[in-house]
Amino acid sequence: MDGTWERLNAALRERLRVRSGRDPQPSAGVVDSQSAKTTGVGGEARGYDGGKKIRGRKRHLLVDTEGLVLEAKVHSAKVPDQDGIGLLLERAREHLPRLSYLWVDAGYRGRGKEWAEKALGLSVEVVHRSPKPTPEKVLFAWAREWHKEGRSVDLDQLFPRRGFEVLPRRWVVERTFAWICHNRRMSKDYERLCATGEAFVYAAMVRLMVRRLARD
């Protein structure tokens, strides 16, 4: 927990970015969090995420547009994303001098977005899901189509059932969480200390990037 894994992650990430023709320092990133259940070993900073109905900790990630981890922060699951972004990005200016643009989800609206813009001078774009149609909207659309066609209308054609939705830019960080969770140690948060959890995030990414570099 002396920062070795974080430094290895940064060195390998920069090498992969240069290999793909990019600047070693990113100018844009994507932020999201994942709530993970903790085990019975005890430890610091545990809490309950009311939205996900999970008791444990959150893994907060900032990734580049390739999904490579720039910053990782582990904290109590009860900390809302609007506050967690401050914990995640507190060293962003020191480590990522070119960073200027962020994509986030709707959980960061309000004070989280405002803090990143004012304190760090970042441009922050909130990526929204497609709006769910209200009953009134469904009824109006059905009546309009019925009047136009003079026959019954299939509502599933007007409003397809919503399943998994790939969100622009946001899918990149979701894929990173999937990469990390391929490691059995990351299926839950087994650690007593948040710093140990952060080290395992970086270690998982180091493993992935070493394999990529070894293939070439």
PLM ranges: what are they?
Residues 1-216:
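Short alpha-helical elements
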